[in-house]
């Protein structure tokens, strides 16, 4: 056995084991803890190695501008998964600079159409790219005053109560939603508009209370405006397949008809449209811009 060094410390503790007592083994364990000076050559070499490793790691990192340039090109669903990578990634994705870059980048992508059909006490939301099969998103309960729904950058704001005092904002890209604080509006129907403030880079909801409106006669077409300024015209009633949407460009004075497949063929059982409770188109939206809200 080697001789114990002078700068070592001997620590003893006892333990109980049946096997050691049977064979006459002492119940004392000697542990040698080496005390190494902080100024010893071995410690100095270890510290130098760690410092060199940190320098090499920092030099291997990509510039922040290049990281944001890569992230802005990814889909919103992919960025939502990247939030769990680290706190650094989460702060980068949630930063205001990346959100503005992402909005600008997504505006160049192909647009999507959103349809909200109502049957009796339910509203059904569908989304579809131009000339593609519609995809069912979710169902929300409809009240007697479900006549207001606002939309911007893929975010849909709608009310869940009779007077729309409880508002929900739904992100169609990440399929996540948040419920806004309830607003007291008992004797008036609440009107709300969802908008985007490009200066501060935030989304805002404008709420107004107006007297109850008398329900007007059902119109034949629903309309809205795309990000490019085209007017959207969609039939209010669910016709025989295929379902179609008309685009009108006021600058070029041109009209184009787009067929949307899948709303009646694949979702007729879901809507359960009958003559007594026909399906009615309540809203139609168009969006080319995605949002990173609720990330």
From Swiss-Prot:
<dbReference type="InterPro" id="IPR017451">
    <property type="entry name" value="F-box-assoc_interact_dom"/>
</dbReference>
<dbReference type="InterPro" id="IPR001810">
    <property type="entry name" value="F-box_dom"/>
</dbReference>
<feature type="domain" description="F-box">
    <location>
        <begin position="56"/>
        <end position="102"/>
    </location>
</feature>
<dbReference type="Pfam" id="PF00646">
    <property type="entry name" value="F-box"/>
</dbReference>
<protein>
    <recommendedName>
        <fullName>Putative F-box protein At5g44220</fullName>
    </recommendedName>
</protein>
<dbReference type="InterPro" id="IPR036047">
    <property type="entry name" value="F-box-like_dom_sf"/>
</dbReference>
